[in-house]
């Protein structure tokens, strides 16, 4: 992201004069990141008290060898992430999703997305989900405008899911929530037999998932290694 900390602080001062629901994103695992950087980020949170905070772990993609050498180790990244988690809890934030915390209330938009409910996506690259139909719009502005002028949907991807695929997507997203999935609620939408099949697949011989009454959720270890844990749904 091209902005500096100074840029962010300047924009924040302007925004907080006009808006009350603001979110601040942090990324853990960046090149050259160390304990001092984490301390400064924590200090910013404590000073600004944003209503909502997101802390994401950097996804390693096609980094060249020079950049890869400057990345913190996996153990260091986990240590930094846990430090963020502890600092946010100490500061009065409530964690409601793997990477998201709030002071007074969670993001309703985020909850609708993670609970896999209906939402309409409008504009470039926007995604929507209605019933079992999921789509993503094209990212090219000229193509987007042309499709609309022709009376066509500007979708780059569009698919009506099967029951099994819709269930897998629902589990994949709602398991990111600290509360996990309400299995009884899922049974109103999906086959109970199909649900139990996936629950057994996730829970058996796994340190990552636990079933508590009618809820299925990630364990503390599963939250820390969510990418690996949720691969069982792929």
Model-predicted regions and their roles:
Residues 28-35, 50-73, 95-111, 125-135, ...:
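Flexible glycine/acidic-rich beta-alpha junction loops that bind and position SAM and/or redox cofactors
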Residues 88-94, 209:
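Short glycine-aromatic motifs
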Residues 111-115, 123-206, 210:
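Hydrophobic, secondary-structure "cap" segments at the distal end of domains
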Residues 103-104, 116, 213-216:
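Self-splicing inteins and homing endonuclease
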Residues 1-89:
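Conserved non-cysteine loop/helix-boundary elements of the Radical SAM core domain that shape
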Residues 221-234:
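Short, amphipathic alpha-helical interaction segments positioned at domain boundaries
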